[in-house]
C-alpha cells in the first residue's frame, strides 16, 4: 500500500484520492482506511523514508547544503508531494514530526557550512528550508527534459544568495 501511495502521490500530489491509492495497491478502500485512517497518516508513512534518506545522506561530516539540495532535486523528480507535506501546516503532530526532523538536519548543515565559511552569517535555517521547497517545486513542475536546467538556475540563485559577504 505504501509503494502504491508513493506512486500515486508522485503522479497526483498529496490531493490524489484514496481510491486511486487503493486501486493501485489492489485493495479495497476499506483495507486502506483500516491501515491508514486518514490522508495524513498515509502520507507520513510514505514520506518517512524520504526524511530518513535525507538524514542518512547528510549525516557524514563532509556533507553540505549543496548535498542536501542535490538530494532534494532527486526526490523532487519522483515526488513534490514530500516537499508539500514537510512544508505544510505543521499543526498535525505527525507532519510536525517529519518537519522537525527535516528542520534539524537543515540546522546541522547551516551550522556546519557557516563554520566552514561556505555560507554567510546572514543565512538562516529558514532560508535554506525555503530554498529547498522552491527548488523542489520548480524542478518537479518543469518538463522532464528541462529539469536539469531548472535545477541549475535555482542552484545558481541560491549560491549567490547564500555566499559569504
Predicted regions: what they are:
Residues 1, 21-24, 39, 127-128, ...:
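Generic hydrophobic secondary-structure packing signal
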